[in-house]
């Protein structure tokens, strides 16, 4: 991988330097690219860039990256990436595994981390693929994940959370877990998945329900617990 990170942040309510950690990559021989600020390298100064250059020859599966400078990733500097295995032992279980089969869960705060209450009150919103509602505003956009009846999907579930864990489920659907934290997993069929900050799962989903809309739910461990008006929710659309 060659990933050039450019620090162009200029919001004075947030940290303007940065350092990116590629979560759970072993970094054998490239510890300088691991991204722990002030441990492996200095942060990238505003207006400058840094090229992270590393390999992952024996690792496949679901990963994520995030700022490793103080609380910066809680303000949104985080994301997912998938390393595909050309010899995936689960390939016969699914028909679709692409950029549309990623599901990210994150907590979102209306106040920048360094100005807030250190998360003691819980997040204002749970974001599913970057969108979510907060109490008192039922108009905010919800993520819609489109699937086709009769197809089999491999979904990559990633917790980008800064603090809470979530219980993830899809109404009227079962999920079969096949990967945990980039390690192939014995098949385990469940109704829900409890996922903590930094964890990743892959699950196989067969779309065998009636054509309809189904709630995707991510119940946080603290904060706003309700699903009222679409809080902590997204939509699976058959």
Curated annotation (Swiss-Prot):
Q: List the disulfide bonds.
A: 74-162
Q: Which residues are glycosylated?
A: 8, 165
InterPro entries assigned: Cu-oxidase-like_N, Cu-oxidase_2nd, Cu-oxidase_fam, Cu_oxidase_CS, Cupredoxin
Q: How is its activity regulated?
A: Activity is strongly promoted by toluene. Activity is promoted by magnesium, potassium, cadmium, zinc, nickel, sodium, lead and manganese ions. Completely inhibited by IAA (cysteine protease inhibitor), PMSF (serine protease inhibitor), DEP (histidine protease inhibitor) and NAI (tyrosine protease inhibitor). Inhibited by ethanol, acetone, SDS, and EDTA. Activity is strongly inhibited by mercury ions. Also inhibited by lithium, aluminum, calcium, barium and iron ions.
Gene Ontology cellular component?
A: extracellular region
Entry note: cofactor: Binds 4 Cu cations per monomer.
Q: How does activity depend on temperature?
A: Optimum temperature is 50 degrees Celsius. Retains over 57 percent activity when incubated for 2 hours at temperatures between 30-65 degrees Celsius.
Intracellular or extracellular location(s): Secreted
A Gene Ontology biological process annotation? lignin catabolic process
- Per the entry, which co-factors are needed? Cu cation
Biotech and industrial use: Able to metabolize the endocrine disrupting chemical (EDC) 17beta-estradiol (E2), and so could be used in biotechnological and industrial applications that require the biodegradation and bioremediation of the environmental pollutant.
GO molecular-function terms, A-Z:
copper ion binding; hydroquinone:oxygen oxidoreductase activity
Q: Give the EC number.
A: 1.10.3.2
Keyword vocabulary terms for this entry: Copper, Disulfide bond, Glycoprotein, Lignin degradation, Metal-binding, Oxidoreductase, Secreted
Indicate where this protein is primarily found: secreted
Which protein family is it in?
Belongs to the multicopper oxidase family.
Q: How does it assemble?
A: Monomer.
The name this protein carries in UniProt is Laccase-S
Output the lineage of the source organism: Eukaryota, Fungi, Dikarya, Basidiomycota, Agaricomycotina
């Amino acid at each position: 991988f060659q990933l050039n990170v450019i620090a162009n942040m200029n919001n004075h309510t947030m940290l303007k330097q940065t350092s990116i950690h590629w979560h759970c990559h072993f970094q054998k021989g490239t510890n300088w690219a691991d991204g722990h600020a002030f441990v492996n390298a200095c942060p990238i100064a505003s207006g400058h860039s840094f090229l992270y250059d590393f390999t992952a020859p024996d690792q496949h599966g679901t990963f994520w990256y995030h700022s490793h400078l103080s609380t910066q990733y809680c303000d949104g500097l985080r994301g997912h990436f998938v390393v595909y295995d050309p010899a995936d032992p689960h390939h016969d279980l699914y028909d679709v595994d692409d950029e549309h089969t990623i599901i990210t869960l994150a907590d979102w705060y209306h106040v920048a981390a360094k100005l807030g209450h250190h998360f003691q009150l819980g997040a204002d919103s749970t974001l599913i693929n970057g969108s979510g509602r907060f109490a008192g505003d039922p108009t905010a956009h919800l993520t819609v994940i489109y699937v086709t009846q009769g197809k089999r999907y491999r979904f990559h579930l990633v917790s980008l959370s800064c603090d809470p864990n979530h219980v993830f489920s899809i109404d009227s659907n079962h999920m079969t877990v096949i990967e945990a934290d980039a390690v192939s997993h014995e098949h385990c069929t469940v109704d829900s998945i409890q996922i903590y900050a930094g964890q990743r799962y892959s699950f196989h989903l067969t779309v065998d329900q009636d054509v309809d809309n189904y709630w995707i739910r991510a119940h946080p461990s603290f904060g706003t617990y309700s699903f009222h008006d679409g809080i902590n929710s997204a939509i699976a659309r058959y």
